[in-house]
Each structure stands twice: as structure tokens, then as C-alpha cells.
């Protein structure tokens, strides 16, 4: 059994400012972000989680720590869970790179112009991380790495999954062995998902 519970970090101060960052920084969770992490921890109660893994970036690690503390477990950092390489977009605002019609992800050819990490590279490292461990494990990471994992199992590219918006502290559950996506950016663990996890 290989079940991955992918959780985006809670709201951070740079989320509020709209700034992009892929570095191991000192950006903090907001008070709201900490409450979001506590909510995720409460939703995971009763699930037999083996281990907790996190991107080394502070906003993700702090989220993972809040959740893992409620299970009396440690957090292990995994470089493969780090934010997408942002290239020339690092430290800038995402809305600088949209055409005014749409907001959200940086998409299409502009990603190449900004020398961002290639989507297939991001997919490869994230999927390797979640496929390498047995049991039910939690992986706290960032929006694009989660979107990349989802797009991998849906056999889609970056542009085909532009509309996927992974909210702060939301949970995406994937049965990695069979490629089944059980939740997509959920904020609660439903009875049907709990039942599935408990019978694996």
C-alpha cells in the first residue's frame, strides 16, 4: 500500500503579499495559516499515518510540524518536495506575468521565458518522492508540486491543468499504486475516504 496525502502549506506572509519564492526562506505562516494547519491535523485524526515529510521551505515545514505534533511524530525534509524552480520569477509577484484576462498560475510559453523548472522535471521528482514509501504518508509541499502530481496521474500537462487551484492547507489524497485520486484539494476527510484508507 502506498497512499500519499499531499497537503499544501498554510497561508504565509508572502502569500498575502502575492510574492513568489522557491528558496529556503524565513517567511512565516500567518495566524490564519497556523489555524489552517491545525484544522488539517484535526481532519487527519484517526488515520494511521506512518510518517510526515516536508519541503525544506519554512512555510511548508512549519505547517508539517504543527500537523505532525498532533501525532507525536517528527517531520523529515525531502528536497524533492521543494517549490517549483521559479527562475527569473523568484521574488516577484505572479500578477506581473499574466495578460490581464486570467489570474493564478504562470502558464504556457512564459514559463520558458522565465527559465522556470520544466513541468516534467517537477512531476518526476514529486512522484518519485511519494512512490518511494510504503504505508499512508503525509507530504507537505506547495501548490505547483501538488498540481504536478495530480497532472501526472491524470496524464495531463501543465497547461491542461491550469484550472486546478490548490488552496492553502488543502489535502489531495492519492493511491499511488493504482494511480487513483481520492480527493483533490479537499479541506475535510470524508467518511468514504476514511473507509478506503482503513481497509487498505
Curated annotation (Swiss-Prot):
Function: Catalyzes the interconversion of 2-phosphoglycerate and 3-phosphoglycerate.
SUPFAM superfamilies: Phosphoglycerate mutase-like
This protein's name: 2,3-bisphosphoglycerate-dependent phosphoglycerate mutase
Keyword Ribonucleoprotein: no
Family: Belongs to the phosphoglycerate mutase family.
Membrane-spanning intervals of the chain: none
Enzyme's top EC category: isomerase
Subunit annotation: Homodimer.
Pfam families found in the cross-reference section: His_Phos_1
Any one GO molecular function term: phosphoglycerate mutase activity
Enzyme Commission (EC) number: 5.4.2.11
Induction trigger: Inhibited by vanadate. Inhibition can partially be relieved by EDTA.
Matching PANTHER family: BROAD-SPECIFICITY PHOSPHATASE YOR283W-RELATED (PTHR48100), HISTIDINE PHOSPHATASE FAMILY PROTEIN-RELATED (PTHR48100:SF1)
GO biological process, one term: glycolytic process
Gene Ontology cellular component terms for the protein in this record: cytoplasm
This protein's pathway: Carbohydrate degradation; glycolysis; pyruvate from D-glyceraldehyde 3-phosphate: step 3/5
The entry's keywords: Glycolysis, Isomerase
Catalytic residue list: 9 (tele-phosphohistidine intermediate), 142
Record field: catalytic activity: (2R)-2-phosphoglycerate = (2R)-3-phosphoglycerate
Keyword Isomerase among UniProt keywords: yes
